[in-house]
Swiss-Prot record:
There is a cross-link at residues 164, 254 (Glycyl lysine isopeptide (Lys-Gly) (interchain with G-Cter in SUMO2)). This is Proliferating cell nuclear antigen. GO terms for cellular component: centrosome; chromatin; cyclin-dependent protein kinase holoenzyme complex; male germ cell nucleus; nuclear body; nuclear lamina; nuclear replication fork; nucleus. The lineage of its organism: Eukaryota, Metazoa, Chordata, Craniata, Vertebrata. Disulfide bonds join 135-162. Gene3D superfamilies: 3.70.10.10.
Length: 261
């Protein structure tokens, strides 16, 4: 049997909001260590990897490993029925074809329970190699979301240029071009407002803004976001989830066309 109780149920609601527009269905791998999900998006351009460690839940029990095929749109609809303050419990029998979701109001005067049908999914796990990155930028997640949103009014792609002193986001399109440069911050009162850059070598890469705007739906999960970049390997956009784990998105850079062609 699997049972996990999360007093801060809003975390699960935010996770689903961050996944559902990118992935239709995915396999939730449940083990004694926690909950993991790894899936390509429906157009096979980006990859999502979610980890929620068992110790981040308030109670957690998993007698044997489970692979639950979940329609994320359905799960998101059910989680919308939970209040932001609700305590959420997930429960499934070992060979179950349904997942139970129980929402308890904090005053315990209201309990809602839902059962969601599970799916049979054929899933291939992709190995994600450990990688050293040329540039790692940590910045406020709201700032990154705004930059991606603003530049998508200008063009379809963003060029991210990372140097020691700062990181530049540029886009160009029919109406012209736009550049946003963030300098490394030296002294900030709050750590989550800082921009920090670890650079081994400068990097300049181009990415589709459509996907970055999907990724920034995870902004409510974390006050900061980390961008890890190296030439010719996918960008990693990572949102830490409190004391529970992380949500990582991987996106391959666009290959620049030959001069003007």
């Amino acid at each position: 049997m699997f049972e996990a109780r999360l007093i801060q149920g809003s975390i699960l609601k935010k996770v689903l909001e961050a996944l559902k527009d990118l992935i239709n269905e995915a396999c939730w791998d449940i083990s004694s260590g926690g909950v993991n999900l790894q899936s390509m998006d429906s157009s096979h351009v980006s990859l999502v990897q979610l980890t929620l460690r068992s110790e981040g839940f308030d109670t957690y029990r998993c007698d044997r490993n489970l692979a639950m095929g979940v329609n994320l749109t359905s799960m998101s609809k059910i989680l919308k029925c939970a209040g932001n303050e609700d305590i959420i419990t997930l429960r499934a029998e070992d060979n179950a074809d349904t997942l139970a979701l129980v929402f308890e109001a904090p005053n315990q005067e209201k309990v809602s329970d839902y059962e969601m049908k599970l799916m049979d999914l054929d899933v291939e796990q992709l190995g994600i190699p450990e990688q050293e990155y040329s540039c790692v930028v940590k910045m406020p997640s709201g700032e990154f979301a705004r930059i991606c949103r603003d530049l998508s009014h200008i063009g379809d792609a963003v060029v991210i240029s990372c140097a020691k002193d700062g990181v530049k986001f540029s886009a160009s399109g029919e109406l012209g071009n736009g550049n946003i440069k963030l300098s490394q911050t030296s002294n900030v009162d709050k750590e989550e407002e800082a921009v920090s850059i670890e650079m081994n070598e400068p990097v300049q890469l181009t990415f589709a803004l459509r996907y970055l705007n999907f990724f920034t739906k995870a902004t409510p999960l974390s006050p900061t976001v980390t961008l890890s970049m190296s030439a010719d390997v996918p960008l990693v956009v990572e949102y830490k989830i409190a004391d529970m784990g992380h949500l990582k998105y991987y996106l391959a850079p666009k290959i620049e066309d030959e001069e003007g062609s």
